[in-house]
Amino acid sequence: MQGVQEQIEELQTKLAFQELTVEELNQEVIKLNRLVAYQQHQIQLLVGKLQAMEPSNIATQAEETPPPHY
């Protein structure tokens, strides 16, 4: 059976590793939040460009006449 001091040291070691893991995960969350914000900005730019585009002269599928073999 371990002594009380050994148990305390083991718990302190586990706590130190958990604190390190929490900090590493926190840094990953921060990076992912920045990435999501960047991607949202890029999507907004693309939506703006799509909305600003002139309508195409190409007919839509609904406007096309069916091919002769129908």
Swiss-Prot record:
Coiled coil: none annotated. It comes from the Bacteria. InterPro entries: SlyX. Pfam families: SlyX (PF04102). Belongs to the SlyX family. This is Protein SlyX homolog. The gene is slyX.
